[in-house]
């Protein structure tokens, strides 16, 4: 059994994929988090809960959880997440892309901090999803953000 946490879970795409790929119960989602900052309505989280239940699901700012209630994040073997892409997306020009320093780009550090704080119990596996412009955005740092993530 591969104990898995799902960050930036949205409506549960990673979970559906993992469960569909391994119908033998190989993956167990032990904790999930979905939070849309600045929004009173948490539609994605509501859909996640409707589909999978609210047990072990967190609908709050992941940065707050990591900084103030870290011990509530269970030990896990696999961390999956599609961290927000707005600061890398083609919806912005390369000059306006903020990258890892942007409002949403900084959420990468929540992933990093979970791994760092778990130390000897850090997950063995990490599976992340983002847009291809992560490799070349922002213009002022061409590829440095991705290099920082890999080095972390």
Question: What positions do the PLM features span?
Answer:
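Conserved active-site and SAM-binding loop architecture
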Residues: 1-152
């Amino acid at each position: 059994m591969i104990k898995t946490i799902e960050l930036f879970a949205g409506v549960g795409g990673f979970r559906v994929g993992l469960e569909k790929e391994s119908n033998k119960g190989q993956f167990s989602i032990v904790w999930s988090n979905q939070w849309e900052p600045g929004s009173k309505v948490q539609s994605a989280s509501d859909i996640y809960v409707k589909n999978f239940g609210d047990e072990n699901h967190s609908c709050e700012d992941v940065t707050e959880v990591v900084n103030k209630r870290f011990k509530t994040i269970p030990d896990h073997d696999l961390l999956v997440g599609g961290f927000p892409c707005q600061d890398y997306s083609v919806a912005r020009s390369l000059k306006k892309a903020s990258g890892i320093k942007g409002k949403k780009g900084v959420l990468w550090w929540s992933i990093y901090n979970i791994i760092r704080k778990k130390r000897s119990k850090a997950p063995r596996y990490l599976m992340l999803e983002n847009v291809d412009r992560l490799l070349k955005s922002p213009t002022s740092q061409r590829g440095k953000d991705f290099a920082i993530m890999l080095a972390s």
